[in-house]
Protein backbone atom coordinates (compact mmCIF):
# COMPACT_ATOMS: atom_id res chain seq x y z
CA UNK A 1 0.00 0.00 0.00
CA UNK A 2 1.22 3.50 -0.78
CA UNK A 3 2.21 5.51 2.26
CA UNK A 4 -0.12 8.35 1.23
CA UNK A 5 -3.10 6.06 1.82
CA UNK A 6 -1.75 4.99 5.20
CA UNK A 7 -1.35 8.62 6.29
CA UNK A 8 -4.80 9.68 5.02
CA UNK A 9 -6.52 12.05 7.48
CA UNK A 10 -3.33 12.21 9.55
CA UNK A 11 -0.63 14.15 7.70
CA UNK A 12 0.08 15.06 4.06
CA UNK A 13 3.22 13.83 2.33
CA UNK A 14 4.62 14.00 -1.21
CA UNK A 15 6.45 10.75 -0.61
CA UNK A 16 5.68 7.82 -2.91
CA UNK A 17 6.54 4.60 -1.15
CA UNK A 18 5.16 1.06 -1.04
CA UNK A 19 4.63 -0.25 2.49
CA UNK A 20 4.08 -3.88 3.55
CA UNK A 21 3.28 -3.40 7.24
CA UNK A 22 3.35 -1.24 10.37
CA UNK A 23 5.47 -1.94 13.43
CA UNK A 24 5.99 -0.50 16.91
CA UNK A 25 8.62 -3.07 17.84
CA UNK A 26 11.86 -3.89 16.06
CA UNK A 27 11.63 -7.47 17.37
CA UNK A 28 8.60 -8.10 15.17
CA UNK A 29 9.44 -5.65 12.36
CA UNK A 30 9.64 -7.12 8.86
CA UNK A 31 11.29 -5.90 5.69
CA UNK A 32 9.09 -3.27 4.01
CA UNK A 33 7.46 -2.09 7.24
CA UNK A 34 7.08 1.47 8.48
CA UNK A 35 8.58 1.79 11.96
CA UNK A 36 6.51 3.93 14.33
CA UNK A 37 8.85 5.42 16.93
CA UNK A 38 6.97 6.22 20.14
CA UNK A 39 7.89 7.00 23.71
CA UNK A 40 7.69 3.76 25.70
CA UNK A 41 7.64 3.14 29.45
CA UNK A 42 11.43 3.32 29.70
CA UNK A 43 12.84 4.29 26.31
CA UNK A 44 11.86 6.17 23.15
CA UNK A 45 11.48 4.35 19.85
CA UNK A 46 14.00 6.76 18.33
CA UNK A 47 16.72 4.72 20.04
CA UNK A 48 15.78 1.73 17.89
CA UNK A 49 15.58 3.43 14.49
CA UNK A 50 18.99 2.22 13.34
CA UNK A 51 18.03 -1.33 14.27
CA UNK A 52 14.74 -0.92 12.39
CA UNK A 53 16.61 0.26 9.30
CA UNK A 54 18.98 -2.71 9.52
CA UNK A 55 15.95 -5.00 9.55
CA UNK A 56 14.52 -3.38 6.42
CA UNK A 57 12.07 -0.68 7.44
CA UNK A 58 11.28 1.68 4.55
CA UNK A 59 10.23 4.76 6.55
CA UNK A 60 9.91 6.04 10.10
CA UNK A 61 7.08 7.95 11.75
CA UNK A 62 8.28 10.16 14.59
CA UNK A 63 6.29 11.94 17.29
CA UNK A 64 6.99 15.66 17.38
CA UNK A 65 10.72 15.41 16.72
CA UNK A 66 12.93 15.86 13.67
CA UNK A 67 15.33 13.00 13.10
CA UNK A 68 17.83 12.41 10.31
CA UNK A 69 18.21 8.80 9.22
CA UNK A 70 18.90 6.68 6.13
CA UNK A 71 15.21 6.23 5.29
CA UNK A 72 12.46 8.84 5.00
CA UNK A 73 11.25 10.10 8.37
CA UNK A 74 7.86 11.75 8.74
CA UNK A 75 6.95 13.90 11.71
CA UNK A 76 3.43 13.33 13.05
CA UNK A 77 2.29 15.50 15.93
CA UNK A 78 0.53 13.54 18.68
CA UNK A 79 1.47 10.34 16.88
CA UNK A 80 0.14 8.02 19.58
CA UNK A 81 -3.39 9.38 19.12
CA UNK A 82 -3.26 8.39 15.44
CA UNK A 83 -2.30 4.73 15.88
CA UNK A 84 -5.83 3.42 15.40
CA UNK A 85 -6.28 5.52 12.24
CA UNK A 86 -2.99 4.19 10.87
CA UNK A 87 -4.10 0.64 11.65
CA UNK A 88 -7.54 1.11 10.06
CA UNK A 89 -6.05 2.78 6.97
CA UNK A 90 -3.60 -0.06 6.36
CA UNK A 91 -5.34 -3.20 7.63
CA UNK A 92 -8.57 -2.53 5.77
CA UNK A 93 -10.11 -6.01 5.99
CA UNK A 94 -9.62 -6.37 9.76
CA UNK A 95 -13.12 -4.94 10.19
CA UNK A 96 -14.62 -8.00 8.48
CA UNK A 97 -13.99 -10.23 11.50
CA UNK A 98 -16.69 -10.53 14.19
CA UNK A 99 -15.01 -9.65 17.51
CA UNK A 100 -15.65 -10.85 21.07
CA UNK A 101 -13.72 -9.31 23.97
CA UNK A 102 -13.23 -10.90 27.40
CA UNK A 103 -12.07 -8.77 30.32
CA UNK A 104 -11.60 -9.47 34.03
CA UNK A 105 -8.83 -10.17 36.51
CA UNK A 106 -9.07 -13.94 36.20
CA UNK A 107 -10.67 -16.23 33.64
CA UNK A 108 -9.92 -14.26 30.45
CA UNK A 109 -7.81 -17.00 28.92
CA UNK A 110 -10.09 -19.86 29.97
CA UNK A 111 -13.29 -18.17 28.78
CA UNK A 112 -11.67 -17.18 25.47
CA UNK A 113 -10.48 -20.71 24.84
CA UNK A 114 -13.76 -22.31 25.88
CA UNK A 115 -15.58 -20.06 23.39
CA UNK A 116 -13.06 -21.06 20.74
CA UNK A 117 -13.39 -24.77 21.55
CA UNK A 118 -17.19 -24.61 21.35
CA UNK A 119 -16.98 -22.83 17.99
CA UNK A 120 -14.50 -25.44 16.76
CA UNK A 121 -16.94 -28.20 17.72
CA UNK A 122 -19.65 -26.25 15.89
CA UNK A 123 -17.39 -26.07 12.81
CA UNK A 124 -17.14 -22.28 12.91
CA UNK A 125 -13.75 -20.85 11.99
CA UNK A 126 -12.36 -18.68 14.78
CA UNK A 127 -9.18 -17.43 16.38
CA UNK A 128 -8.02 -16.33 19.83
CA UNK A 129 -5.75 -13.37 20.61
CA UNK A 130 -4.39 -13.30 24.15
CA UNK A 131 -2.03 -14.60 26.80
CA UNK A 132 -1.24 -17.83 24.94
CA UNK A 133 -0.44 -15.95 21.73
CA UNK A 134 -2.52 -15.57 18.59
CA UNK A 135 -4.02 -18.81 17.33
CA UNK A 136 -4.12 -19.70 13.64
CA UNK A 137 -1.37 -17.21 12.85
CA UNK A 138 2.40 -17.07 13.06
CA UNK A 139 2.25 -13.93 15.20
CA UNK A 140 3.39 -14.22 18.81
CA UNK A 141 2.99 -11.88 21.77
CA UNK A 142 4.43 -11.48 25.26
CA UNK A 143 1.45 -9.42 26.44
CA UNK A 144 -2.07 -10.57 27.32
CA UNK A 145 -3.27 -8.11 24.67
CA UNK A 146 -0.68 -7.46 21.91
CA UNK A 147 0.07 -4.02 20.49
CA UNK A 148 -2.48 -2.40 18.21
CA UNK A 149 -0.69 -3.16 14.93
CA UNK A 150 -0.20 -6.82 15.86
CA UNK A 151 -3.91 -7.12 16.60
CA UNK A 152 -5.00 -5.48 13.35
CA UNK A 153 -2.43 -7.49 11.38
CA UNK A 154 -3.72 -10.72 12.90
CA UNK A 155 -7.33 -9.77 12.15
CA UNK A 156 -6.35 -8.98 8.56
CA UNK A 157 -4.76 -12.44 8.34
CA UNK A 158 -7.88 -14.01 9.84
CA UNK A 159 -10.06 -12.24 7.28
CA UNK A 160 -7.87 -13.43 4.41
CA UNK A 161 -8.11 -17.01 5.70
CA UNK A 162 -11.91 -16.85 6.15
CA UNK A 163 -11.65 -16.92 9.95
CA UNK A 164 -14.91 -15.20 10.77
CA UNK A 165 -14.76 -14.76 14.56
CA UNK A 166 -11.95 -13.65 16.87
CA UNK A 167 -11.98 -13.75 20.66
CA UNK A 168 -9.65 -11.17 22.23
CA UNK A 169 -8.47 -11.03 25.83
CA UNK A 170 -8.91 -7.37 26.77
CA UNK A 171 -6.50 -6.52 29.58
CA UNK A 172 -6.89 -3.36 31.64
CA UNK A 173 -3.53 -2.13 30.32
CA UNK A 174 -4.70 -2.58 26.73
CA UNK A 175 -7.95 -0.74 27.38
CA UNK A 176 -6.13 2.17 29.02
CA UNK A 177 -3.35 2.32 26.42
CA UNK A 178 -5.66 2.26 23.41
CA UNK A 179 -4.45 -1.04 21.97
CA UNK A 180 -8.04 -1.92 21.03
CA UNK A 181 -8.89 1.54 19.70
CA UNK A 182 -10.96 1.58 16.53
CA UNK A 183 -12.26 -1.96 16.96
CA UNK A 184 -15.94 -2.74 17.46
CA UNK A 185 -16.94 -5.80 19.48
CA UNK A 186 -20.18 -7.69 19.01
CA UNK A 187 -19.81 -8.84 22.64
CA UNK A 188 -17.96 -7.70 25.73
CA UNK A 189 -17.70 -10.25 28.54
CA UNK A 190 -16.84 -9.43 32.17
CA UNK A 191 -15.56 -12.35 34.29
CA UNK A 192 -14.55 -10.87 37.68
CA UNK A 193 -12.54 -8.16 39.41
CA UNK A 194 -10.05 -8.81 42.21
CA UNK A 195 -6.77 -7.15 43.20
CA UNK A 196 -4.02 -7.06 40.60
CA UNK A 197 -1.99 -4.49 38.64
CA UNK A 198 -2.21 -1.80 41.32
CA UNK A 199 1.40 -0.94 40.51
CA UNK A 200 -0.11 0.47 37.29
CA UNK A 201 -3.65 1.55 38.25
CA UNK A 202 -2.86 2.65 41.84
CA UNK A 203 -6.42 2.05 43.15
CA UNK A 204 -9.12 -0.58 42.69
CA UNK A 205 -11.50 2.15 41.48
CA UNK A 206 -9.07 3.04 38.68
CA UNK A 207 -8.64 -0.64 37.85
CA UNK A 208 -12.40 -1.14 37.69
CA UNK A 209 -12.85 1.92 35.48
CA UNK A 210 -10.20 0.58 33.09
CA UNK A 211 -12.13 -2.67 32.72
CA UNK A 212 -15.35 -0.70 32.34
CA UNK A 213 -14.07 1.02 29.19
CA UNK A 214 -15.00 -2.12 27.26
CA UNK A 215 -18.69 -1.46 27.95
CA UNK A 216 -18.80 2.27 27.26
CA UNK A 217 -20.17 3.98 24.16
CA UNK A 218 -20.24 1.70 21.11
CA UNK A 219 -17.13 -0.29 21.97
CA UNK A 220 -19.25 -3.42 22.59
CA UNK A 221 -22.72 -3.99 21.16
CA UNK A 222 -23.71 -6.59 23.79
CA UNK A 223 -22.57 -7.02 27.39
CA UNK A 224 -22.33 -10.38 29.20
CA UNK A 225 -21.76 -9.77 32.92
CA UNK A 226 -20.91 -12.17 35.77
CA UNK A 227 -23.50 -11.36 38.42
CA UNK A 228 -21.61 -13.48 41.00
CA UNK A 229 -18.89 -10.82 41.15
CA UNK A 230 -19.36 -8.12 43.78
CA UNK A 231 -18.59 -5.44 41.17
CA UNK A 232 -21.24 -6.62 38.74
CA UNK A 233 -23.60 -3.68 39.37
CA UNK A 234 -20.95 -1.21 38.20
CA UNK A 235 -20.62 -3.10 34.93
CA UNK A 236 -24.39 -3.42 34.56
CA UNK A 237 -24.73 0.34 35.02
CA UNK A 238 -21.89 1.01 32.57
CA UNK A 239 -23.51 -1.21 29.94
CA UNK A 240 -27.17 -0.37 30.67
CA UNK A 241 -27.79 0.84 27.11
CA UNK A 242 -26.84 -2.59 25.74
CA UNK A 243 -29.52 -4.65 27.56
CA UNK A 244 -26.80 -6.67 29.31
CA UNK A 245 -27.05 -10.41 29.82
CA UNK A 246 -26.02 -11.70 33.23
CA UNK A 247 -24.75 -15.15 34.15
CA UNK A 248 -23.88 -16.97 37.34
CA UNK A 249 -23.27 -20.42 38.74
CA UNK A 250 -26.90 -20.53 39.87
CA UNK A 251 -27.86 -20.75 36.18
CA UNK A 252 -27.19 -24.45 36.75
CA UNK A 253 -30.15 -26.37 38.18
CA UNK A 254 -27.61 -28.40 40.13
CA UNK A 255 -23.96 -29.43 40.10
CA UNK A 256 -21.88 -31.86 42.11
CA UNK A 257 -18.26 -32.91 42.10
CA UNK A 258 -17.23 -35.88 39.99
CA UNK A 259 -13.91 -37.62 39.47
CA UNK A 260 -13.17 -35.53 36.38
CA UNK A 261 -14.96 -32.28 37.24
CA UNK A 262 -18.68 -31.75 37.80
CA UNK A 263 -22.00 -33.38 36.99
CA UNK A 264 -24.23 -30.46 35.98
CA UNK A 265 -27.72 -29.69 34.81
CA UNK A 266 -28.21 -26.67 32.57
CA UNK A 267 -31.80 -26.17 31.47
CA UNK A 268 -32.97 -29.68 30.49
CA UNK A 269 -29.50 -31.12 29.93
CA UNK A 270 -27.46 -33.21 32.39
CA UNK A 271 -23.79 -33.59 31.49
CA UNK A 272 -20.31 -33.93 32.98
CA UNK A 273 -18.14 -30.83 32.73
CA UNK A 274 -14.55 -32.17 32.62
CA UNK A 275 -13.04 -29.15 34.38
CA UNK A 276 -12.08 -28.82 38.05
CA UNK A 277 -12.80 -25.77 40.21
CA UNK A 278 -16.06 -23.88 40.71
CA UNK A 279 -14.49 -20.93 38.90
CA UNK A 280 -14.53 -23.11 35.79
CA UNK A 281 -18.28 -23.53 36.15
CA UNK A 282 -18.49 -19.76 35.84
CA UNK A 283 -16.04 -19.71 32.92
CA UNK A 284 -17.95 -22.41 31.05
CA UNK A 285 -21.31 -20.64 31.58
CA UNK A 286 -19.78 -17.41 30.26
CA UNK A 287 -18.61 -19.22 27.13
CA UNK A 288 -22.03 -20.86 26.71
CA UNK A 289 -23.76 -17.45 26.84
CA UNK A 290 -21.31 -15.97 24.36
CA UNK A 291 -21.83 -18.72 21.79
CA UNK A 292 -25.60 -18.56 22.31
CA UNK A 293 -25.46 -14.84 21.46
CA UNK A 294 -23.89 -15.81 18.14
CA UNK A 295 -27.13 -17.57 17.20
CA UNK A 296 -26.53 -21.17 18.29
CA UNK A 297 -29.09 -22.97 20.46
CA UNK A 298 -28.89 -25.22 23.52
CA UNK A 299 -29.16 -28.41 21.46
CA UNK A 300 -26.07 -27.33 19.57
CA UNK A 301 -23.99 -25.91 22.43
CA UNK A 302 -24.59 -27.85 25.64
CA UNK A 303 -23.48 -31.33 24.44
CA UNK A 304 -20.07 -29.84 23.66
CA UNK A 305 -19.63 -28.41 27.17
CA UNK A 306 -18.84 -32.02 28.11
CA UNK A 307 -15.86 -31.92 25.74
CA UNK A 308 -14.14 -28.76 26.98
CA UNK A 309 -10.52 -28.96 28.10
CA UNK A 310 -8.46 -26.42 30.07
CA UNK A 311 -5.94 -24.22 28.25
CA UNK A 312 -2.26 -25.01 28.93
CA UNK A 313 -1.21 -24.04 32.45
CA UNK A 314 -4.76 -23.55 33.72
CA UNK A 315 -5.41 -26.17 36.44
CA UNK A 316 -3.45 -28.57 34.27
CA UNK A 317 -2.95 -32.02 35.78
CA UNK A 318 0.39 -33.56 34.86
CA UNK A 319 0.39 -37.13 33.55
CA UNK A 320 -2.46 -38.34 35.80
CA UNK A 321 -0.37 -37.47 38.86
CA UNK A 322 -1.33 -35.43 41.92
CA UNK A 323 0.66 -32.51 40.51
CA UNK A 324 -1.12 -29.50 39.04
CA UNK A 325 0.14 -26.44 37.18
CA UNK A 326 -1.81 -23.19 37.33
CA UNK A 327 -1.20 -19.61 36.24
CA UNK A 328 -2.59 -18.32 39.56
CA UNK A 329 -0.67 -15.12 40.26
CA UNK A 330 -3.34 -13.10 42.08
CA UNK A 331 -4.78 -13.62 45.57
CA UNK A 332 -8.17 -14.68 44.21
CA UNK A 333 -6.71 -17.09 41.66
CA UNK A 334 -4.42 -18.71 44.25
CA UNK A 335 -7.37 -19.06 46.64
CA UNK A 336 -9.46 -20.69 43.90
CA UNK A 337 -6.72 -23.10 42.85
CA UNK A 338 -5.92 -24.25 46.38
CA UNK A 339 -9.60 -24.54 47.31
CA UNK A 340 -10.12 -26.65 44.20
CA UNK A 341 -7.39 -29.09 45.21
CA UNK A 342 -8.74 -29.22 48.76
CA UNK A 343 -12.13 -30.24 47.36
CA UNK A 344 -10.62 -32.65 44.82
CA UNK A 345 -8.38 -34.34 47.41
CA UNK A 346 -10.31 -34.04 50.70
CA UNK A 347 -8.07 -36.51 52.58
CA UNK A 348 -4.73 -35.32 51.18
CA UNK A 349 -2.16 -32.83 52.39
CA UNK A 350 -1.91 -29.92 49.97
CA UNK A 351 1.47 -28.43 49.08
CA UNK A 352 2.02 -25.27 47.06
CA UNK A 353 4.99 -23.72 45.29
CA UNK A 354 4.72 -20.06 44.34
CA UNK A 355 6.36 -16.65 44.32
CA UNK A 356 5.35 -13.17 43.17
CA UNK A 357 6.50 -11.12 40.20
CA UNK A 358 9.05 -8.38 40.73
CA UNK A 359 8.32 -4.77 39.72
CA UNK A 360 4.61 -5.53 39.98
CA UNK A 361 1.78 -4.98 42.49
CA UNK A 362 3.50 -5.39 45.88
CA UNK A 363 0.24 -5.14 47.80
CA UNK A 364 -0.87 -8.64 46.79
CA UNK A 365 2.21 -10.43 48.14
CA UNK A 366 1.24 -10.51 51.80
CA UNK A 367 -2.33 -11.41 50.79
CA UNK A 368 -1.07 -14.40 48.81
CA UNK A 369 1.09 -15.51 51.73
CA UNK A 370 -1.96 -15.43 53.98
CA UNK A 371 -4.06 -17.40 51.50
CA UNK A 372 -1.36 -20.05 51.11
CA UNK A 373 -1.19 -20.34 54.91
CA UNK A 374 -4.92 -20.86 55.18
CA UNK A 375 -5.40 -23.19 52.22
CA UNK A 376 -2.22 -25.31 52.06
CA UNK A 377 -0.54 -27.65 54.54
CA UNK A 378 2.98 -26.79 53.40
CA UNK A 379 4.49 -24.00 51.31
CA UNK A 380 7.62 -23.61 49.21
CA UNK A 381 8.37 -20.00 48.34
CA UNK A 382 10.46 -19.47 45.24
CA UNK A 383 11.19 -17.04 42.42
CA UNK A 384 8.46 -16.16 39.96
CA UNK A 385 9.78 -13.46 37.60
CA UNK A 386 11.85 -11.35 40.03
CA UNK A 387 12.86 -8.89 37.30
CA UNK A 388 14.91 -6.05 38.83
CA UNK A 389 13.87 -6.68 42.45
CA UNK A 390 15.85 -8.53 45.09
CA UNK A 391 14.31 -12.05 45.13
CA UNK A 392 14.66 -12.35 48.90
CA UNK A 393 12.86 -9.04 49.41
CA UNK A 394 9.90 -10.41 47.43
CA UNK A 395 9.91 -13.55 49.58
CA UNK A 396 10.00 -11.42 52.73
CA UNK A 397 6.90 -9.55 51.55
CA UNK A 398 5.08 -12.87 51.08
CA UNK A 399 6.30 -14.19 54.44
CA UNK A 400 4.66 -11.23 56.16
CA UNK A 401 1.33 -12.92 55.42
CA UNK A 402 2.21 -16.44 56.52
CA UNK A 403 1.73 -17.79 60.01
CA UNK A 404 4.64 -18.63 62.29
CA UNK A 405 3.46 -22.21 62.68
CA UNK A 406 3.27 -22.83 58.92
CA UNK A 407 5.53 -25.35 57.23
CA UNK A 408 7.36 -22.93 54.94
CA UNK A 409 10.50 -23.61 52.91
CA UNK A 410 12.41 -21.08 50.83
CA UNK A 411 14.11 -22.38 47.69
CA UNK A 412 14.82 -19.40 45.44
CA UNK A 413 15.81 -21.45 42.39
CA UNK A 414 12.42 -22.34 40.89
CA UNK A 415 13.68 -25.47 39.15
CA UNK A 416 15.21 -26.77 42.38
CA UNK A 417 11.99 -25.95 44.25
CA UNK A 418 9.87 -27.95 41.79
CA UNK A 419 12.26 -30.91 41.73
CA UNK A 420 12.54 -30.98 45.53
CA UNK A 421 8.76 -30.88 46.00
CA UNK A 422 8.07 -33.64 43.48
CA UNK A 423 10.82 -35.92 44.77
CA UNK A 424 9.50 -35.66 48.33
CA UNK A 425 5.79 -35.77 47.48
CA UNK A 426 3.95 -38.48 49.41
CA UNK A 427 1.23 -40.78 48.05
CA UNK A 428 -1.46 -38.84 49.90
CA UNK A 429 -0.21 -35.39 48.98
CA UNK A 430 -1.15 -33.09 46.11
CA UNK A 431 1.09 -30.33 44.75
CA UNK A 432 0.11 -27.03 43.16
CA UNK A 433 2.83 -25.24 41.17
CA UNK A 434 1.38 -21.76 40.87
CA UNK A 435 2.16 -18.49 39.15
CA UNK A 436 3.67 -19.15 35.73
CA UNK A 437 1.38 -21.69 34.12
CA UNK A 438 2.03 -21.87 30.39
CA UNK A 439 5.02 -19.49 30.42
CA UNK A 440 8.24 -20.71 28.82
CA UNK A 441 10.60 -18.04 30.16
CA UNK A 442 11.66 -16.59 33.50
CA UNK A 443 12.71 -12.95 33.80
CA UNK A 444 15.64 -12.41 36.16
CA UNK A 445 17.12 -8.93 36.12
CA UNK A 446 16.64 -7.60 32.61
CA UNK A 447 17.15 -10.97 30.92
CA UNK A 448 14.60 -13.57 29.91
CA UNK A 449 15.75 -17.17 30.39
CA UNK A 450 14.13 -20.33 28.99
CA UNK A 451 12.07 -21.94 31.75
CA UNK A 452 8.86 -23.96 31.89
CA UNK A 453 7.13 -25.19 35.05
CA UNK A 454 5.50 -27.90 32.95
CA UNK A 455 8.75 -29.18 31.42
CA UNK A 456 10.66 -29.11 34.72
CA UNK A 457 7.86 -30.95 36.52
CA UNK A 458 7.44 -33.58 33.80
CA UNK A 459 11.20 -34.17 33.79
CA UNK A 460 11.17 -34.59 37.59
CA UNK A 461 8.38 -37.17 37.26
CA UNK A 462 10.46 -39.44 35.01
Give the label of every model feature segment.
Residues 1-15, 31-34, 44-47, 243, ...:
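ATP-dependent carboxylate-amine ligase
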Residues 1-85, 89, 230, 250, ...:
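N-terminal leader/targeting and accessory segments in enzymes
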Residues 3-5, 63-70, 161-164, 176, ...:
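Acidic, Mg2+-coordinating active-site environments of NTP-dependent enzymes
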Residues 13-22, 82-85, 146-149, 168-174, ...:
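Short gly/ser/thr-rich secondary-structure transition/capping motifs
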Residues 19, 32, 57, 70-71, ...:
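Short, well-ordered alpha-helix to beta-strand connector turns
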Residues 58-64, 223-227, 353-354, 377-385:
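Short internal beta-strands
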Residues 64-66, 131-132, 172, 193, ...:
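Short, ordered loop/turn segments at secondary-structure junctions
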Residues 83-227, 231-242, 292, 345:
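Phosphate-binding loop of NTP-binding sites
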Amino acid sequence: MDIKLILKNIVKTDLTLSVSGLSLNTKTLKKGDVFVALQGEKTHGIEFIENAIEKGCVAVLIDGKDFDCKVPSIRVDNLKAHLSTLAQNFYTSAKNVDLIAVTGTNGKTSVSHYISQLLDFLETDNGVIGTLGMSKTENKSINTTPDIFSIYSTLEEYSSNKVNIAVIEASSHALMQGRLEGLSFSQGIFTNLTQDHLDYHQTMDNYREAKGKLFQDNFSKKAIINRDDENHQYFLDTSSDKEPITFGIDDLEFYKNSENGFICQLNDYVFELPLVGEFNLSNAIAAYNSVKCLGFNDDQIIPYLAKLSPPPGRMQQLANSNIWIDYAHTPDALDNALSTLRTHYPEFNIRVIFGCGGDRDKGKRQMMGKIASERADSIILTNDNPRSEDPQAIIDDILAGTKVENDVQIILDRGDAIRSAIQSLGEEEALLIAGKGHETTQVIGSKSHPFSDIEVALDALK
